[in-house]
Design a protein with these regions (language model features):
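Ligand/substrate-recognition segments at binding pockets and active sites
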Residues: 1-67, 136
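Alpha-helical interaction segments
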Residues: 69, 85, 105, 119-120
Length: 165
């Protein structure tokens, strides 16, 4: 496996976000094993937002996807060709048609089938590669109890109480 003649590309990451820098370094080493030269370009956060995210000037990047709204439409809409948040410039007419049918449908089973079609298209075209889910760290003074972790990023302090001393 690998690329006999190899190739090179640049991973552009914000210089102020260590998890992305660390991930880029791991990817660089892994790509080297298959004959691919990945260069890491560190840029300031403001430049990353304007050049990479907004103006889509990059070969490759790492990004944390906001999953605060995990409805099918919210997660899949970002890949429609004309979506402002489609910063990877993904464009696929079949995907766009399936997504439009999904959001237009009033039948939940039909909507689900169209969303599955969208996911199949994304998977087959490798629109994105999800590589990690960063852990959540919480520092809590030991005088408090009742903090709960949730599968999504939620800070619910309703059950937080002073511990019995």
């Amino acid at each position: 496996a690998g690329f006999e003649d190899g190739f090179s590309f640049t991973i552009t990451v914000p210089s102020n976000y260590q998890p992305h820098i660390d991930t880029a370094q791991v990817l660089k080493e892994e790509f080297k094993k298959i004959g691919v030269d990945a260069q890491i370009q560190l840029i300031e956060w403001d430049s990353w937002v304007s050049d990479v995210y907004q103006n889509r000037q990059f070969q490759s990047t790492l990004v944390g996807v906001d999953a605060s709204n995990i409805t099918g439409s919210a997660m899949l809409q970002r890949f429609t060709s004309d979506n402002a948040k489609n910063f990877i410039n993904y464009s696929n007419a079949d995907y766009d048609a399936a997504f439009e049918k999904a959001i237009s449908s009033t039948n939940d089973d039909e909507k689900t089938q169209y969303y599955k079609e969208c996911e199949r298209i994304l998977s087959e075209s490798a629109a994105n590669v999800y590589i990690q889910d960063l852990p959540e760290f919480v520092a809590l003074n030991k005088k408090y109890t009742g903090y709960e972790f949730y599968p999504l990023y939620i800070q619910d302090i309703a059950k937080l109480r002073l511990a019995d001393e």
